[in-house]
Amino acid sequence: MRKERLEKGSWLGMLITLGVVYGDIGTSPLYVMNALINDAGPLKNATPDYVIGSVSLIFWTLMLITTVKYVLVALRADNHHEGGIFALYALVRHRAKWLIFVALIGGAALLADGTLTPAVTVTSAVEGLKGLPDLRAFSQYSWLVPLSVTLILVSLFTIQVLGTAVVGRSFGPMMLLWFIVIGGIGLLNISQAPAILRAFSPVYAIQVLFSPTNKMGIFILGSVFLATTGAEALYSDMGHVGKANIDATWPFVYAMLILNYLGQGAWMLTHSQGPAWRNVTNINPFYEMIPSGGRIAMIVLATVAAIIASQALITGSYTLVDEAVGLKFLPRMIIKHPSNVRSQIYIGAINWLLCLVTLSIVWLFQTSAHMEAAYGLAITLTMLMTTILLSQWVQMKGHRFWSLALLAGFGLLETLFLVASLTKFIHGGYLTLGLTLMIFLIMVVWFFGNRRRLRYNQADEQISLLNYRSQLIQLSQDDNQPLFATNLVYLAKVDQLHRVKRSILYSILDKRPKRAKVYWFITINETNRPYDCSYSVDMLGTRNVVEVRLNLGFRKSQHINRYLRAIVTSLIADHSIDPQYSNYGITQPRQVGDFKFVVQNQQIMDLAGNPTMHQFDRFLIGGRIFLQNITPSPAIWYGLEFSDVLEETIPLFTKPMTDPALVHLAKRQTTRHQV
């Protein structure tokens, strides 16, 4: 589907949006009211005031946070049609240096807490099988639920390689059916207890926070917040489906969700004081309000919807990581584009890492009740960080008053949710906070490690090829040096002033000189056009020192050896470089010689070579080098696995250094003798 149609909105775009964006927030009714009942204890404690107040809290939480903050405000803060906390940070980062920590905390928390989303939603749906008499085994054998969830999640993560559009088209109709069904069931139950409609009044929401029937007090907000954890996905997935499609579909989704929450509340009002229900604990009104004849069909539909809920998290994670790589918060990864829309991506490393962590959580907690107790803590941090960045964006647009109002209003509200969610820490929230800290440290080390490295050698980091042309020409013609390669290729990122990293020329000239007939310095630019494939050449006034700028579309193969061979053939044909005849080869005559690609790596132990470096800088720079060495090599990014590649270890600092503490002892002795 074309990006332009996604941005303008269409029926197909809205269907894809239902399948991609709303899975998380759309399946919250599976577990939110269950969590609120667990907070109350036995069902008899869920008095009418408690039930109406709880549903009112859900209604106004969805209204204020999801509708007002995200749909009405955040979706307007798009960065070239992309959303998410990192895209927002890129818009406002020039306003203050400290904002980078806001973005890093928010992004890390979103990635960490998202690992619980697939686990809790799919487990909640599958647990519905426990209530079926014909499937008593799910109650008798506790391992059957996590095993079933594992099989479902592995299948989901496996199909991600097909792309967002394919997955969205498949899931969209199912989510449309899901929302219609849960809204309809909710409406049927509302008719049995119309008093639940009083939940539309915010008075009941405020009263329940301080009511003696609410044993949790303000900490009830920790369970209420589960209703809106998927709100951040609306913003993160904007680049996948377009703002117009989210604007068009959210009113429908919101209405269906509220009808279902009201229906669950109505069922609780009707049954909470009944003899058969008074002392029941850990009951899920979502399934109980469904007629027994439709229970099996609803469990199947809920399981499908729970699978789709995981989709919103997965696509959002891809976008978040892609933006983090672009901002140099994370190492470069292999990113695939299954469609012609650039923002629709697939990152295999993230996909399977997310799968591994999610499955670990499933087997660690095993029940949805345990997962709900841990779910939502880290995401409150993300929402609070998004609010801070949004206030900066509103102020940047010239609305200082509204900026302060947004920061004060939503900042206070989300701080309350954060405080209320702190009780989750001992119940498993420590896991997501631990993941948040780990991801945050990785991003800090990668970003600031590079900044500190550049600080130490920035003055001499870039040197001009023009100043070394004569040496390269002379080396190329020096028969006293063995021929290293016919074509020696460096992936160099040459700037407009013909400057490259000092380490590249150090590799050619300062180490054992690498004689080649032609030296190639390749700069690769990824363009917004999916199948772009063009190049420009600068011979630098020579016949054997060549700059090449290769422009490749984001869907175009990046196997640069194929393109380079065609470029060499073209330059030989127009007599820009000499033919590279060879007497050996399967095909003859052969005019293009061999290629040698050089990939440079650095080692942590090289940090000892700079005695003036601070210890904290050693940690940051060393950490970055370590991360760089365990991530995929450029040889893999550019399809050079089967080419002749030299992976070369180079010094971190190629400029010669001296230790100011070094003393010439002979000179001191002579001076002492003279005295």
Curated annotation (Swiss-Prot):
InterPro entries: K+_transporter, K_trans_C, K_trans_N, Kup
GO molecular function, one term: symporter activity
Ranges annotated as spanning the membrane: 12-32, 55-75, 98-118, 143-163, 170-190, 216-236, 249-269, 296-316, 345-365, 374-394, 401-421, 428-448
Alphabetical keyword list: Cell membrane, Ion transport, Membrane, Potassium, Potassium transport, Symport, Transmembrane, Transmembrane helix, Transport
UniProt keyword Ion transport present: yes
Reaction catalysis annotation: K(+)(in) + H(+)(in) = K(+)(out) + H(+)(out)
Highest taxon, organism lineage: Bacteria
Topology versus the membrane: Multi-pass membrane protein
Subcellular localization, as worded in the UniProt entry: Cell membrane
Gene Ontology cellular-component annotations: plasma membrane
Family listed: Belongs to the HAK/KUP transporter (TC 2.A.72) family.
Described function: Transport of potassium into the cell. Likely operates as a K(+):H(+) symporter.
Protein name, entry field: Probable potassium transport system protein Kup
Species name: Levilactobacillus brevis (strain ATCC 367 / BCRC 12310 / CIP 105137 / JCM 1170 / LMG 11437 / NCIMB 947 / NCTC 947)
